[in-house]
Amino acid sequence: YNKVKDSGYSCCILKGQGNAVMYPNPLIRIPGDVDVWVNAVRDEIRSLAHSLAENANGHVDDESFNHVGLTVNGITVELHTTPGFMANFVYNRRLQRWLKLNVDEQCSNMVALPNDAGLVAVPTHSFNVVYQLYHLYHHYFYEGVGLRQVVDYYFVVTMLNVECEMLSSLQSELKHLGLWKFAGAMMYVLHKVMGLTEDKMIAPMNAKRGQMLLDDILNGGNFGHYDKHHVLGHNLLRLYRDARLLRYYPAEALSEPIFRVWHFLWRVLNKKFS
């Protein structure tokens, strides 16, 4: 975080390390890689990744539509040009617009790390309640949702003081971004797994979608490692997942195969001209 800041870019730490500060004991949460949202254009982030890797005897790993990956001191880091994307082009356009409107506030929301490790910028609770719901939705389609992510989102929701006017605005935002149906499923999961009470919920529970989501979480886990269909291979597993989710989330399920082709072409062209 400090090295990115010292390079002249505003940024914030997404998910993992930022979520840990919400836990009663932040040290009990085991983080994965480090996700950094950098307020800069792609070429600047690409140059930054190479600079950070060279200065730490690391290496740049990969580049996708929303991040440049690198390894420094044995730690996997993703520098995000944008913290997310959706397969449906209409909802993705809305999501990108929403993210751009919120980036400055997130990069200036400073919190103290445990054990006097310093200050870092992390997203606000009001941002996270939408963004991390999106992130769960993305994992549901592409990789699988793990219980750690469910626990994270429980703390995000319970930390939010939702007033009637704010709740109405939040629900409108979720509908605008195509996350409303999934929000109902997630509230059901949080109620069943974590005992979330209805007065804390950001949407009405949907038992049918929620039970399907919970079954997938218990059977597959994060990144779908325990899914019995994992033997199908990455692409066939995605098609299988799209087919299952088509009934409940048609906009994203129908768009995902098209987006996958677009993303493949984007990678080819971007690699050619980068």
Q: What residues fall within each predicted segment?
A:
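Conserved NTP-donor binding/palm subdomain of two-metal-ion nucleotidyltransferases/polymerases, i.e.
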Residues: 1-32, 38-274
